[in-house]
Swiss-Prot record:
Peptide chain release factor 1 directs the termination of translation in response to the peptide chain termination codons UAG and UAA. The keyword Transport does not apply. Pfam families: PCRF, RF-1. This is Peptide chain release factor 1. One of its GO terms (cellular component) is cytoplasm. SMART domains: PCRF. The modification N5-methylglutamine is found at Q232.
């Protein structure tokens, strides 16, 4: 591990030197690339330097155990447990930081939320979950845009598409893909019976032009007037755009902007993300076919979480996590849940790496 860490440190130092290179400073694209790579290594290098200092301190303190000076010997005995604990914690952190990075982690995301089983109650919950993610995005300092939204018959939303942009959005949001189940007594329930409804959340990394090539000849564009709640027209021009990708049958729609050109640009972002997601899923299926039968994967059809309102309980079925703070969670306080998912999958990846098996995808 030390050899690998020293290689990373040397690379970090070269990148740091490049930031003072006039040729790099004159090339904005190259400067951005160097800055981004250096930032990605900084946390690992800082941890390694701290680890190296702790090892040096530990070696020095262990030498004091053989000292003839009683005070030095007593100090060594007192200091050793803390230094060993610090060493072990840093080793664990470094192993995590050395895990292969998900190439999509730094990407923005396109988030789709769809009401599933449960009728009107599912639509109401779909809107609540959308608002939960919008509040979480606000806490993280991300930019959120609702690209498209279809209202439910009795409130809520049948489906919604949202973009989240900011620092490493996919690295956090990727754990949210799957079926979310809600158990509660609907406001219209007169007998006090608990109903179960479901929604589906899809989190796709936003693809760039270099990630996926789209043949314009494969796309049919349709324009229409934007509609609001209840289906009424909210625009007197044909600004809403629907794109149909004939090879895959994918259909995307955007009516957020008043400009048809802007809506078409947004719709193309959605289409590229869906095509990229299909390709990524194909790769994951090939790579992880044996493991997927045993461990949760973020599959769209996998029930990942239950929100039980009568018991004030959130359960994440993939990792066995239970949280009793539903009001806080629905208000956007989901960081602890996401962190628990990240920790679980990192531990699984370490196990797989040690055993030489396929790395879990999450």
């Amino acid at each position: 591990m030390i050899d690998k860490l020293e290689d990373v440190e040397r690379r970090f130092e070269r990148l740091t030197a490049d930031l003072s290179n006039p040729d790099v400073l004159a090339d904005s694209a190259r400067l951005q690339k160097v800055s981004k790579e250096r930032a990605g290594l900084e946390k690992l290098v800082e941890a390694f330097r701290t680890y190296r200092k702790v090892l040096a301190d530990l070696s020095e303190v262990e030498a004091w155990l053989g000292s003839s000076d009683a005070d030095e010997k007593a100090f060594a005995r007192e200091s050793l447990p803390g230094l060993k604990e610090q060493r072990d914690e840093l080793e664990a952190s470094l192993k995590i930081l050395l895990l292969p990075k998900d190439p999509n982690d730094e990407k923005n995301v396109i988030l789709e939320i769809r009401a599933g089983a449960g009728g009107d109650e599912a639509a109401l919950f779909a809107e609540e979950v959308m608002q939960m993610y919008l509040r979480y995005a606000d806490r993280r300092g991300w930019k959120a845009d609702i690209l498209d939204m279809s209202p439910g018959n009795a409130g809520g939303v049948k489906d919604a598409t949202v973009t989240l942009s900011g620092d490493a959005v996919f690295s956090s949001m990727k754990y949210e893909s799957g079926v979310h189940r809600v158990q509660r007594v609907p406001a219209t329930e007169t007998q006090g019976r608990i109903h179960t409804s479901t929604i589906t959340v899809s989190v796709m990394p936003e693809a760039e032009d270099v990630d996926v090539q789209v043949n314009p000849a494969d796309i049919e564009m349709q324009v229409m007037r934007s509609t609001g709640s209840g289906g009424q027209s909210v625009n007197t021009t044909d600004s809403a755009v629907r794109l149909i990708h004939h090879p895959t049958g994918i259909v995307v729609k955007c009516q957020q902007e008043k400009s048809q050109l802007k809506n078409r640009t947004m719709a193309m972002r959605m289409l590229r993300a869906k095509l990229y997601d299909i390709e990524q899923e194909r790769i994951r299926n090939e790579r992880d076919s044996a493991r997927r039968a045993q461990v949760g994967t973020g599959d769209r059809s996998e029930k990942i979480r239950t929100y039980n309102f009568p018991q004030d309980r959130l359960t994440d079925h993939r990792i066995g996590l239970t949280v009793h703070n539903l009001p806080g969670v629905m208000a956007g306080d989901v960081e602890d849940v996401i962190t628990a998912c990240r920790t679980f999958y990192q531990a699984e990846a370490l196990k797989a790496q040690t055993a030489g098996g396929p790395k879990p995808s999450a």
